């Protein structure tokens, strides 16, 4: 029938477009940078770009609540972690009716950092990141990624003069 053909021709591609949009909305993108602090101390900064209209949860933790953002740094040879992961961005805090608790969220961008001490001229640190994003209606399934951050000692520092082997 004509109505069926119209439905098949117009509505199915539109429905497929909405399904594709929902599937790609999860695309939080992550980038890393390295800042020299002093001597052999550096700060690895991770930045998330969060697509509108979604928000991403802060590092919590939230028992019985949303999946908080979790970042685990694994240092390679010639580098050690100094302290824990810090949130550089300030989350917006509000009471969430769904989870019945106060939670912190980021919209647009979120920045996190880990301080490290370099004992070799070059080293790598892996960052395993897990997060979840939601809008006002629903949440996407939790997602994860892993970044590898390359560190190179600044000239004139003890690490730059090190002959320690890095694998």
Describe each PLM feature range:
Residues 1-2:
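Short, Lys/Arg-enriched N-terminal segments with co-localized hydrophobic residues
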Residues 5-8:
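Short hydrophobic helices that act as membrane-entry/anchoring signals
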Residues 10-19:
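Bacterial N-terminal signal peptides
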Residues 23-167:
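Extracellular/lumen-exposed scaffold segments
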